[in-house]
């Protein structure tokens, strides 16, 4: 066996439904999100995780706590696992962002926010730091956010910047599995869950099902 990382996205929030950029804004799970967290926890518990780490934002932390209750594991909080900072876009929908900042929206670079490279560097460093704390056959669960996890995984996998479009987004309470091998990390599963969940996150429109924010 080799080390594995389960990258679990948080459950649904009201702003997910409204297609608003959440970023660092602390929006809680809605009723659907709470149910999604409980459902994913019952499934992921069967994988016998050895450590759970989470973003400090409540939508991710509460999702992680649901898994912690089932497994009996504590949840460690790490601010480095936060979502991409959206700057002036936080709380806005894609239509508003595109109308006010057409050039920035086309490049998907939020004014006053983080770049993709900054997020990828931040999140991947946290993931790799935490995975070093588990045994060689251990399973780390990282509970975070849509854009943060996609970008972090791309950096962990070592994919070149021009190939970052090849990995799709994660639905609410869906997860991906990274496996460590002799030649590095590889994808074992992507966007897994009980049923496919619509993808609406703080990520580029092409990584969402409906092209909105």
Language-model features, listed with the residues they occupy:
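Loop-to-helix element that buttresses phosphate recognition and phosphoryl-transfer chemistry
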Residues: 5-63, 112-125
